[in-house]
């Protein structure tokens, strides 16, 4: 790619509650993936010349976590701390991608059913602080569907902060049938911390929570039949796995491996009065027009990091089959790259020639203000 072309390449930035995925439109994977964390020192710096900063972002915050207080500016998919969010965007553009934002149109993503003020403020910061020439805000689940090469289907997107079901027909999201569940990866990590404590292992601090997140990502899986799996775990050691902690201590984990993600299907495990992800998917389909349900049942697309557990697709298939009419054909699509499918969809969308007239330009923003985002982005 010549320098001339690189100038106008769009930037795609998927701001998740847990990870920021960013890169250039047309690429097949994000260039930069780092935790959505801003850390501030808990102690006063005493050594002169150490170049201590008053805040650290992403991987640097993660590596210095022992001396920092870590905060996630995005909670349940909603930006709650704008100053920190600005730091994250600044870090993305200048340190990770090393671009001048005023030269690149920028595509951002957000969770469905977010407060309107959230996307207005995103728009305002992009144009006024970063001076981008153009920008767009896309719904995460819709992008995942693009990435799977479909225009019709129901997306079950589960990330770190929020899970949602979005039925989409011929490229249109059906807002009345969107189901949002504030139960996701972070809650599962907390639950695993809790049940490991019952085994006698203690995990408390924000740093130790990150260790438990790693255990979760490496060892957890979804049981096809929970009761039967519990019986197997009780009668033999075949399901036990060991994990080495950073200090060399080895811990053994058994039924916790599948009890943790079971929460997705039984939110009552963590005291939530809510239907599991299989039921929210079914309810979402039932809120759609009777004529399009068949197409949705046949195109159940999983996306997001919390759908990466082994066994989750088979379990979804089993649970939805039990709820749906008996003659219905049900298909669960679980693409291997689904951890990043929102970003990939954004990369596809931003590089389509037909999309180029969809951008909100700086000129349009100057004329209409932040509310332009509701007119141009659905």
UniProtKB/Swiss-Prot annotation:
Pfam families: Actin (PF00022). It catalyses: ATP + H2O = ADP + phosphate + H(+). Its EC number is 3.6.4.-. It is found in: Cytoplasm, Cytoskeleton. This is Actin, muscle. Actins are highly conserved proteins that are involved in various types of cell motility and are ubiquitously expressed in all eukaryotic cells. Belongs to the actin family. Keywords: ATP-binding, Cytoplasm, Cytoskeleton, Hydrolase, Muscle protein, Nucleotide-binding. Polymerization of globular actin (G-actin) leads to a structural filament (F-actin) in the form of a two-stranded helix. Each actin can bind to 4 others. GO terms for molecular function: ATP binding; hydrolase activity. It is an enzyme of class 3 (hydrolase). One of its GO terms (cellular component) is cytoplasm. CDD domains: ASKHA_NBD_actin.
